[in-house]
Each structure stands twice: as structure tokens, then as C-alpha cells.
Amino acid sequence: MFALIISSKGKTSGFFFNSSFSSSALVGIAPLTAYSALVTPVFKSFLVILPAGLKSKSFAVNTPFKSCWCVIVMCSYFFCVYHLQKQHYCGAPSLYSYLLCL
């Protein structure tokens, strides 16, 4: 089971799959590299894969590049969405990510 969060043009969509659904619906594109190659030309935006069972919430953070959608996992580990076009990770101070969990 995993969560897929895609942000495109300021709108974020979340998709949550259990093991049975993902194996039937995503057969053939399960590898992250293959799936990224499929998503990139369509959404031209952000992609993140999270393990199941982790608490997470998304928020927008401003960077010198543009606004990036990031994810806080378990309110203890800061993990940002990878930008498929710009090939960089958005970041924020750990204290800032901690305050968002309070």
C-alpha cells in the first residue's frame, strides 16, 4: 500500500492504493522510474511516493524556484516532493517543519 500525491498547477490530488488495487491497476508501471517516465509528460509537476500507514500532510513552501508541495511524514521526518521537471528537491528548515506539526 502506498500514497501518491501529484500537484499540478496549484491543485493537489491524493491517491491511496492498497496492495490488491495497486497490483491490478498499476501492473507494468510499478517501478518508480517507469512510473515517473509515464507521469512526467502528462502532469509535468510533482511526484512523491510514501509508505502506507504514515501520517502525512501537505503544504506549500516558497523557494527561490517556485512554490513547492512538500510532505511531513510522522511529524518527525521532513520529506519534500521531488520536482520532475526541475530535477531538484524543495526544502525548508527543520524547525519550520516541526512547527507545522504542532
Curated annotation (Swiss-Prot):
User: Where is it mainly found?
Assistant: membrane
Give compartment(s). Answer: Membrane
Top-level division of the source organism's lineage: Eukaryota
Q: What did gene disruption experiments reveal? A: Displays increased levels of spontaneous RAD52 foci in proliferating diploid cells.
**What is the name listed in the Swiss-Prot or TrEMBL entry for this protein?**
Putative uncharacterized membrane protein IRC2
This protein's GO CC annotations: membrane
Q: Does the keyword Calcium apply?
A: no
* Topology class, membrane: Multi-pass membrane protein
Additional information: Partially overlaps ALT2. Disruption phenotypes caused by deletion of this gene may also be a result of a defect in its overlapping gene.
Alphabetic keyword roster: Membrane, Transmembrane, Transmembrane helix
> Keyword Acyltransferase: yes or no?
no
Mark the transmembrane ranges.
21-43, 58-80
Organism (species): Saccharomyces cerevisiae (strain ATCC 204508 / S288c) (Baker's yeast)
